[in-house]
């Protein structure tokens, strides 16, 4: 609490005693008036002695009020800890602060102990300049400390002031001094309390240091980059690639363009300008007496009745006038006369007799000039100062006035304009619409509607993109591009066995991947980036794209080093669509609304959608991206350059599934001229390269034969003889040189003879040819053989390309579907004259049954084309949906469970025949039992037939051999046994043949006997029907009754109505 000082006994005349009294706490309320007297004399009771340098504090209440008017300054000078407490609403008489929640105060200052009676204490260290400031209410606000009963809070680290505490305020009550919410309490003079206060201050400073600078260590420099908050701002050159910027496209573009002043000045059209005042002479007169409609002509005399001299002035309200400012601005000023104080050009031209008629750009003649009136230029300074200028002689309209709505009339009445135009002002129409109206004799503008609704040009699919191959592919580098591919590679086309060249028990050690940076390939062509085969290895850190084909045998596949592009085709949603979306992988190509599909008529790119596509010069196919499992890695093997196998284990960057491939070019056939000429060209390429490396320009056949292992010496010699000449004598005897008319091509010209795509197509043809040979050797089903031949590469590519040109139709569905479940296209050819049948229709199984024998059309062309297009769309979207599924693969829990996907596998033969095998087997009692087995699986039946045919071939070989040459006794016994078996079979066949002839001969007797055995009831029917069949010689036997001469569907059968006959009516 603050002690109140009464009338002290201290002698204030002494300066030292006065200061001791002040710092001793006797001036608690700062009522210095009790010590220092007022206006009354020294003899008064209330007289107080003043210090020599005392300051008057009478107006301290007014000063406090003035300080309240400066909230910003007071808030700025407060301590930060005080700022968090908020403004004090009120203070009661007991000094309690009102409007402050204790909970909120404790939250803001957790380190301060005590109740709500927290006070602000001023301390003095005794030696700081702040001592006098604190005394005379001029202390710095930063020196204010927040204190409790036990300690002092100093957020700014200020020094202590004095040994005692002062209370600031002008209101005393209950031993408290309150001013603006600041409550001051005198400090105790106890030494222990001071030490505790200093200790609390030190602890609080350590707490603040640990809170705001947790990484602070004594003797180390702080890392201000981590402590100071920095706002993350992108660089000005940085652009987000993933974010698709939406372009700003206003729908209604209407720009108001101001007319060019130069054109208006030089034009001959009528302009709307301000009128010109005239003096004694007329300044301008209208060439036309007609006035515009809607204008009321009022003279100045009616508006302003002024002096006679001013009455002579008239306002010419004509639309063909020129403003005065414009005349002055465009006049030719005589600078010499102006500088020499001569007569101005305007004054000189005032005389109409000396002035010739002037023509302006509008075509009007100026008959008189403006008369310079001296009265208009005589201004009185007093009138200007007193704002008593004379009134304006005409109304002034400010075009920029917001309260005025000015509209310019635009008359489209051509007849009225023609009347106003004089014969001297007739000019040629310069407007484009007027010129078109003059020559618009056939109403050409009416035909413009057809041009708007009809699009004259539709882009025929994106032009062929440029595909750049690597240097090894362009060079057709061996052994990657062989002239003759071995059979084992053709049978495993692009599916080489990974462990074929690895010895069993080999220890695999993974090598480290080679680092390949993007800077190395930046700005380079494909030839430069992949100049050698080492650059094409997968054993580096370059990203890898795995393309898994959905077909078992694609139409054509790229070889080593050939380039492919991943194109993201995007079709515009409408004509105003300017969006160009970009996927993380691939090159974006935008298709117009009317552009054709990149898949011709067998695929679709919907408006506003993206279809990623694998693009090269041989095929096009849609691709579908899939997520890669975190447990999947790629194991690769690399060999070459005299180094053993090296193994690499790396992650997979991108995984795609390739849909059905659509061929771009036709695969040549085995005996086509294209293949024959390519073989000859390939031979020339090899010879040219050998000659370019040989200085003598002569070679032998041996280095050429290495590239053609399937040809002998004579075949190579015959082909080389076409363009080379054999040297029979001379130093080059036995060698071959080019003929005189043959030119040796350099290596660059040799590379252009054959492209890598042609080599890939020939290899695809070779693979199909090898498959055909294997099919003929191991496939015994004639129907399946013919189907496989129709599905060879050169057949299906020809069918597809003809169908894209609308010269043929393909089946779309059926046995030629590579998926086997209706999710792919069948490229088998079908007839365009009613041959196409929609899937699921009953006529799709047997097309020949619906064909009519007449010459009339049994189909509708429009309906067939509609069904054809619908089937294409159905197959395309089914194909897309199936390959887009990203469900994880589920292993079969029960391997014996029937898989529903095998429902299309045949379980019966087409001819409905089964195999019956009768085997003799002894049972457990030693008795021979007959065991009959029926086999219906066509594949098992085919296997048995193949074994039987093989045994027959072995028998024939054994029988053809001469017995005299057989030295082995076992072979003789085997041959004897085979001969006996063959003889028994021949005897059985002879007996069956004889029995068949006897049955034909005795057919009548047999029929009679059978009729008697069947009973008397059936005999009457038989006899009645027999008369009808008399004279017919037939050998047909009924399956129900066994009689000859009819079948079971014939009503003449005696058992036709019996239950055993399946043909009988039920």
Curated annotation (Swiss-Prot):
One BP term from GO: positive regulation of transcription by RNA polymerase II
Catalytic reaction annotation: L-lysyl-[protein] + acetyl-CoA = N(6)-acetyl-L-lysyl-[protein] + CoA + H(+)
GO molecular-function terms, A-Z: chromatin binding; histone acetyltransferase activity; molecular adaptor activity; protein heterodimerization activity; RNA polymerase II general transcription initiation factor activity; TBP-class protein binding
Biased composition (Polar residues): 1000-1014
Additional information: Present with 1500 molecules/cell in log phase SD medium.
Domain characteristics, as noted in the entry: Compared to higher eukaryotes TAF1, yeast TAF1 lacks the C-terminal bromodomains and C-terminal kinase activity. The TFIID interacting proteins BDF1 and BDF2 may substitute for these domains.
Protein name: Transcription initiation factor TFIID subunit 1
Gene: TAF1
